[in-house]
Amino acid sequence: MTISLCRSTARALALATAVAGLSLSAAASNAADLVISNWDGYMAKDIADSFKAATGLTIEVVNHATNEEIMGKLMASQGKGYDVVFVSSPFAEILNGQGMVEPLDHAAIPNIKNLYPEAAALAYDPGNAYSVPYTWGSTGLCYRSDLVKTPVDSWNSLLKPDAALKGKTTMLATDRWLMAAGLLSLGYSVNEKDPAKIEQAKNVLIEAKKTLLAYDDTTFFSKLVSGEAQLVQAWDGWCNYGITENKDIKYVVPKEGSDLWVDTIVVMKNSEHKDAAMKFVDFILDAKNHAWAAQNILYKVPNKPAMESLDPALAKQYPNMAMSPAELAKYELLRDLGASMKDYSRAVSEIKAAN
């Protein structure tokens, strides 16, 4: 995942003023039939051409770097100027709570039948009432099996590393995933709201900081390839980028568990092109189109015929691609924390400020 997860409406609203002008000028004046906002590289580069060939409709794809960026724009404009938006599940949950997303017309999205049953039973949106999952996966440990001489099977392998690993480990910088490692190591929920338990996790992570090479959301896999790092916290698909370059890089979900992250697609309530937007969602859920994400960004997609169409060699090379939906579904979904997000943000600020 290339996204940031400081998941609060308050923060999104705080960003809104700064980006209000951008949101309206970048999208509202567009003459395309649809404006789609997504992370860069998260869809095929020829998506506009292929969608037009299939439907006769034109689209403009605009990119957001983080969930917070697009949330600020959406809050500033109340979603006007955008038709379809890709956001991570806690943000989809926030948008739905704010009344900003359109209920999905399943009759207009026949390819929704391609989703695994588990993908239609996600707790934040059972039945896919207002969102469809685009990609999903786990967060775990990515390591150099040729260099690490101790077992890697627990979050404590990272948080309390062997002496030989000190200064050779990295953790994700983003609030939710950084805190998740500490919470899971203590047997707590990744959505924990008890301030005392959040404080415990914070203290674990302050101690772990003393052993780290860096906090790193974007280059940890290249550090593994070079050997600068030997053990890192990683999203499963990003670990695959390292595995592609070095067969000694391995991925494991720690015995204490993982979060289940989901990136979703929503249609904005204030879209003036809802019928066309539903056609776009259906187009993405076509098995061939959805398989592109698995083949090219190496994340699992929750689309049964799409996954079944993949070369079996992918599952042999990349462990996450072999995970069944049932295996993924046993991990805990990241949820919107509401007012408790401020406790996470405060804890992370204190962790990063600690010596």
At which residue positions do the language-model features occur?
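Early extracytoplasmic/lumenal segment of secretory-pathway proteins
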Residues: A32-I94
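Extracytoplasmic ligand-binding site segments that recognize negatively charged/polar headgroups
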Residues: G81-Y82, F86-T211, D216-E228
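A ligand-binding cleft/hinge motif common to bilobed small-molecule-binding domains
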Residues: F91-I94, V225, L231-D248
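Ligand-binding "clamshell"
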Residues: N96-P103, D125-N128, Y241-V253, A315-P319
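A bilobed periplasmic-binding-protein/Venus flytrap-type ligand-binding module shared by bacterial periplasmic
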Residues: C142-L147, L183-G187, V262-H273, W292
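Periplasmic-binding protein-like
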Residues: I198-E207, I243-K269
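Conserved C-terminal helix/tail region of periplasmic/extracytoplasmic solute-binding proteins
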Residues: S222, P325-N355
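Mature extracytoplasmic/periplasmic domains
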Residues: M268-L328
